[in-house]
UniProtKB/Swiss-Prot annotation:
This is Phosphoribosyl-AMP cyclohydrolase. Its cofactor is Mg(2+); Zn(2+). Pathway: Amino-acid biosynthesis; L-histidine biosynthesis; L-histidine from 5-phospho-alpha-D-ribose 1-diphosphate: step 3/9. It comes from Bacillus cereus (strain AH187). SUPFAM superfamilies: HisI-like. Belongs to the PRA-CH family. Homodimer.
Length: 101
């Protein structure tokens, strides 16, 4: 089973392997997906820069991919990782650190 990239980018929800905590949300195009499979490190597509980026390439806060899951429509991906350092560019463990309710 493969993701359906016919509509463009797919959301990639990144979760920590042990805790299942949601670390971040990013987007993958087909090239980012293939690089993630090949390197076992997360690659994403930046919508603002219109280019690929490798999580942790500059910060050292890398994500080692343990498994990938597709949803039932094949248009969203869950990436299970072993996170090294914080996942958020702000230095927080997760990008979802603002509690609303």
């Amino acid at each position: 089973m493969k993701p359906n990239f016919s509509k463009g980018l797919l959301p990639a929800i990144v979760i920590e392997e042990g805790t299942k905590e949601v670390l971040m949300l990013a987007y993958m195009n087909e090239e980012a997906y293939e690089k993630t499979l090949k390197t076992k490190r997360t690659w994403f597509y930046s919508r603002s820069r219109r280019s690929l980026w490798n999580k942790g390439e500059t910060s050292g806060n890398v994500q080692h991919v343990q498994s990938l899951y597709l949803d039932c429509d094949q248009d969203a991906i869950v990436v299970v990782v072993k996170q090294v350092g914080p996942a958020c560019h702000t230095g927080e463990k997760t990008c979802f650190h603002y509690k609303i309710i």
